């Protein structure tokens, strides 16, 4: 049986708030990662030399982040719209939405942190060669990652950082 119009409107209002919160947090995660990379891997002389190019650079990065996050939110919106034809599906999507958003946000944060570490080692952002690591001796690669990077601290920091969005989504 299809959900009532009032139920649809009420649930969609709540979902819109969650999507907006996710959008803001995800853009902030990507922007924060870009800030860390920028200040960690450039010096003051370089920033002075290319000062006129910084605003367009930041704008281009922001627009890219907005595009990626908006496409991600669009997938959640599409699922919610398709679920409107069934009361059970609508309720299930409403219950699962925040967990899906939190999982994707955690993935974005983990990829951002991974990209910062990857850049620190290889002096370039993630590229197709990062996937080539699987073709190498995976055990040796994982051993190197485990010994050279603060994996446990990064996971603990990510888990702690996700407490804030989890709390915000729970409100």
PLM regions with names:
Residues 19, 23-27, 31, 61, ...:
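Alpha-helical transmembrane spans of integral membrane proteins, capturing the lipid-embedded, hydrophobic core
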Residues 86-87, 159-171:
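Cytosolic-side transmembrane helix boundary signature
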Residues 82-100, 171:
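Cytoplasmic juxtamembrane regions at transmembrane-helix boundaries
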Residues 33-64, 100-157:
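Membrane-interfacial interhelical loops
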Residues 11-24, 92-106:
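Alpha-helical transmembrane segments and their helix-start/interface "positive-inside/aromatic belt" motifs
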Residues 44-48, 72, 92:
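Solvent-exposed, low-complexity, intrinsically disordered
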Residues 51, 76-82:
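Feature captures the catalytic ectodomains and active-site-proximal regions of enzymes
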Residues 2-14:
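Short, Lys/Arg-rich, polar N-terminal cytosolic tail immediately upstream
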């Amino acid at each position: 049986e299809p959900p009532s119009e009032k139920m649809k409107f009420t649930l969609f209002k709540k979902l819109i708030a969650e999507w907006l919160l996710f959008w803001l947090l995800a853009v902030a995660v990507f922007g924060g990662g870009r800030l860390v990379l920028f200040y960690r891997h450039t010096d003051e002389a370089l920033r002075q030399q290319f000062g006129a190019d910084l605003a367009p650079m930041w704008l281009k990065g922001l627009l890219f982040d907005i595009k990626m996050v908006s496409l991600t939110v669009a997938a959640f919106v599409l699922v919610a719209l398709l679920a409107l034809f069934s009361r059970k599906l609508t309720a299930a999507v409403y219950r699962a939405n925040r967990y899906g958003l939190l999982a994707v946000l955690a993935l974005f944060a983990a990829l951002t942190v991974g990209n910062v570490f990857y850049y620190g080692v290889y002096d370039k952002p993630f590229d197709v060669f990062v996937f080539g690591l699987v073709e190498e001796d995976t055990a040796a690669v994982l051993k190197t990652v485990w010994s050279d990077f603060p994996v446990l601290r990064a996971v603990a920091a990510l888990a702690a950082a996700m407490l804030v969005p989890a709390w915000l989504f729970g409100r």
